[in-house]
C-alpha cells in the first residue's frame, strides 16, 4: 500500500501523546488510500521491480539527490550545520560528477547519505507540538504539525517545487516535480512490497499498526536516533532507501 508505505515509513513525537482526534475520517481515508494503492500503485511497483537494477538504482539516486534541496534548508533551520554542509556537498558532487544524481559518487568521497529533513521536523525542533494524528488523501499518515510542514513546502519552502511548479527557470516545468515525487514513491513502494504485505498479513488491526509504525518512525527522525525499519536495497549499487 503505497500511501501508507511512502508516508508511513517516511516519518512525530511520542505515540502516547498524539491523539487520533478524527478517527472516523482517518479510517475512511485510510481505506480509500488502500483501495487506490491496490488498483494503481502496487501494480506499478511490481512492474517497476522488473526493470534492470541499474535503472532502479539510478532513479532512486536521482530522487534522493533532488530531496537535498528541501533537506538542506531544514538542516540549517534546525541548527544542524554539519549535516547541511554534508548534504550540500552531496548535492553538488552528485549533480555534477554523478550526472544529475544518477550515480551516488558523493558517498564514495566520504559524504554519507543522511535522513531527509522536512518542515514538520523543523517545527518539532522549534518546540511545536504534533497535534492530532491525521490520514491525508493520497499523502497518507501525518499529524497536524506534519500537515503544516507540508503546506510550507507548497507555499515556497521547497526549492524543487519553486523551480518546477512556480516556473522559476525555463528548464523545468510542473510535471517534473510531480514525476519526481511519483518516482520516489514507486521506488520506495517496490522496495517494500514484502515488508508491507507481512505487516498487513500479521496485523490484527492494520490501521493501528500503520499508525504506530508511522509515529514511531517520525519520532526517530525528529530525535535523529537509529533506524527502526530496514528497506530493501540494491546492494550491488550501494543504494539503500530507508525513507
Stretches found by the model and what they are:
Residues 11-27:
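Short N-terminal segments immediately surrounding and downstream of signal-peptide cleavage
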Amino acid at each position: 500500500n503505497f500511501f501508507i508505505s511512502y508516508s508511513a515509513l517516511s516519518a512525530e513525537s511520542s505515540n502516547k501523546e498524539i491523539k487520533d482526534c478524527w478517527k472516523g475520517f482517518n479510517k475512511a481515508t485510510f481505506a480509500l488510500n488502500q483501495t487506490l494503492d491496490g488498483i494503481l500503485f502496487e501494480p506499478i511497483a511490481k512492474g517497476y521491480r522488473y526493470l534492470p537494477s541499474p535503472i532502479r538504482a539510478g532513479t532512486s539516486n536521482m530522487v534522493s539527490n533532488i530531496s537535498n534541496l528541501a533537506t538542506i534548508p531544514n538542516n540549517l533551520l534546525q541548527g544542524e550545520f554539519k549535516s547541511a554542509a554534508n548534504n550540500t556537498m552531496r548535492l553538488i558532487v552528485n549533480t555534477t560528477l554523478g550526472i544529475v544524481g544518477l550515480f551516488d559518487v558523493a558517498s564514495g568521497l566520504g559524504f554519507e547519505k543522511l535522513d531527509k529533513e522536512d518542515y514538520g521536523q523543523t517545527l518539532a525542533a522549534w518546540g511545536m507540538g504534533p497535534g492530532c494524528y491525521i490520514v491525508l488523501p493520497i499523502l497518507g499518515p501525518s499529524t497536524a504539525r506534519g500537515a503544516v510542514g507540508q503546506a510550507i513546502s507548497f507555499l515556497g519552502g521547497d526549492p524543487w517545487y519553486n523551480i518546477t511548479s512556480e516556473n522559476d527557470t525555463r528548464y523545468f516545468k510542473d510535471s517534473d516535480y510531480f514525476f519526481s515525487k511519483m518516482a520516489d514513491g514507486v521506488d520506495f513502494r517496490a522496495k517494500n512490497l514484502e515488508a508491507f504485505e507481512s505487516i498487513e498479513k500479521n496485523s490484527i488491526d492494520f490501521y493501528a499498526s500503520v499508525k504506530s509504525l508511522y509515529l514511531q518512525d517520525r519520532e526517530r527522525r525528529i530525535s535523529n536516533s537509529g533506524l527502526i525499519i530496514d528497506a530493501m536495497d540494491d546492494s550491488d549499487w550501494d543504494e539503500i532507501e530507508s525513507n
